[in-house]
């Protein structure tokens, strides 16, 4: 019975340790994400009044927060002997961000003054901010879930729901123009980054607590006033003066913060107004171009319609002329049929004569083929000049007579 009770006690202790560990991990993740949100806001506010560089405390704090977020529950590198050596988040970024177009991974790997992995990771943060691609790098790395699981343990920020919040928070930094020197002391990878929580810590006293404090002061002042003399009236007045001074200081701080926010909002409003005016002017230009193109299209359409109508009229006139010429030729043929037959007979006789002359073998050597008009003309000229003699004709000399 005692052994069972001891076993139950040990089991409850194990469950309590697990729940405590889960709570601590959740609190750690929530703290880092909250501080990251505050650091991004302060960085955006500060960028409205001055250029952000390595000397800016807001940037140094943001870089420390981001470095700790990316190093949260990062697995060690297993050596040949089975031991785990600590590694930097740069080893994860170098593998997971290879798919980013025009990435700066190779250029950071080839930097001469940066040797350690931690220094390369810090250089990557600065280069990504100057390129305005830090959110894109983080989003691409988080989408590669297989690589992320290989580098981080369970309970890491990059494996939880806070990862999507991180990518969304970093998107606002694309509006800031950063200026960093990649040879400064900020790239020293000897010591880990430390977060300064003091700018984000603010104690707010509840209204009940304030009223109870005022009641205590009143009771304390009334008890002292009963047996007080003119000599011991000083301390309550001093306390009252200090309280008014603190209130005035708090009001001044609130006024200064409100003034800075007002300046930031005015600058943002001016930027949006400029963008709106540019968009309106571009819209007017585009509308004018659309109207001009519509007018040109209408004119072109009217011209094409006029050309089509004119071509149709010409086609109709040509068709009527062809029909009229056909009717005229038919009427001429019906009025003079003998002339056409006589012409046909003459043509047939000429063809017959040409064929007969062509069959004579004695003329082929002299005049060639009589199928052409030129050969026929040469033959007729020879006949007229008596150049062709008959084979029965005798050649006699005029001076010789038969005896």
Swiss-Prot record:
Where Phosphoserine occurs, the residues are: 211-212
Q: Which residues form a coiled coil?
A: 296-321
Q: Does the keyword Phosphoprotein apply?
A: yes
| Disulfide bonds, paired cysteine numbers | none
Ranges of biased composition (kind: Polar residues): 220-231
Q: Which residues carry this modification: Omega-N-methylarginine?
A: 13
Record SMART domains? RUN
Family annotation (InterPro entries): Run_dom, Run_dom_sf, RUN_RUNDC3B, RUNDC3A_B
Segments for region (Disordered): 1-20, 207-232
Q: Mind telling me which Pfam families this protein's record contains?
A: RUN
Keyword GTP-binding in the entry? The reply is no
Keywords, in A-Z order: Coiled coil, Methylation, Phosphoprotein
Domain RUN, first and last residues per copy: 53-185
| Record text on subunit structure and interactions | Interacts with RAP2A.
Query: What family does the database annotate?
Result: Belongs to the RUNDC3 family.
Q: What name does the UniProt record give this protein?
A: RUN domain-containing protein 3B
């Amino acid at each position: 019975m005692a052994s069972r009770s001891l076993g139950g006690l040990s089991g409850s202790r194990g469950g309590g340790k697990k729940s405590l560990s889960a709570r601590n991990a959740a609190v750690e993740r929530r703290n880092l994400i909250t501080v990251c949100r505050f650091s991004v806001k302060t960085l955006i506010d500060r960028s409205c009044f001055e250029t952000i560089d390595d000397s800016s405390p807001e940037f140094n704090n943001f870089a420390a927060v981001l470095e700790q977020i990316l190093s949260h529950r990062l697995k060690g590198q297993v050596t040949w002997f089975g031991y785990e050596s600590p590694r930097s988040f740069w080893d994860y970024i170098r593998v997971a961000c290879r798919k980013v177009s025009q990435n700066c991974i190779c250029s950071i790997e080839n930097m001469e003054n940066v040797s350690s992995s931690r220094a390369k990771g810090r250089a990557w943060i600065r280069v990504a901010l100057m390129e305005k691609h830090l959110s894109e790098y983080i989003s691409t790395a988080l989408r590669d879930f297989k690589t992320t699981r290989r580098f981080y343990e369970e309970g890491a920020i990059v494996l939880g729901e806070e990862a999507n919040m991180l990518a969304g928070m970093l998107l606002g930094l694309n509006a800031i123009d950063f200026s960093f020197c990649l040879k400064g002391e900020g790239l020293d990878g000897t010591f880990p980054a430390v977060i300064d929580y003091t700018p984000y810590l603010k104690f707010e006293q509840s209204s009940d607590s304030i009223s109870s404090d005022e009641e205590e002061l009143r009771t304390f002042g009334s008890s002292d006033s009963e047996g007080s003399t003119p000599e011991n009236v000083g301390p309550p007045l001093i306390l009252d003066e200090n309280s008014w001074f603190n209130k005035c200081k708090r009001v001044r701080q609130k006024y200064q913060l409100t003034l800075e926010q007002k300046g930031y909002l005015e600058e943002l409003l001016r930027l949006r107004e400029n963008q709106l005016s540019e968009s309106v002017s571009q819209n007017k230009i585009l509308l004018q171009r659309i109207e001009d193109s519509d007018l040109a299209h209408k004119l072109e359409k009217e011209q094409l319609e006029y050309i089509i109508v004119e071509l149709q009229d010409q086609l109709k006139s040509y068709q009527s002329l062809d029909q009229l010429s056909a009717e005229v030729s038919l009427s001429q043929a019906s009025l003079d049929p003998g002339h056409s037959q006589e012409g046909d007979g003459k043509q047939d006789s000429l063809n017959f004569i040409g064929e007969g002359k062509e069959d004579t073998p004695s003329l082929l050597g002299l005049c060639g083929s009589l199928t052409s008009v030129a050969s026929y003309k040469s033959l007729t000229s020879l006949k007229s000049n008596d150049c062709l003699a008959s084979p029965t004709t005798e050649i006699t000399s005029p001076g010789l007579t038969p005896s």
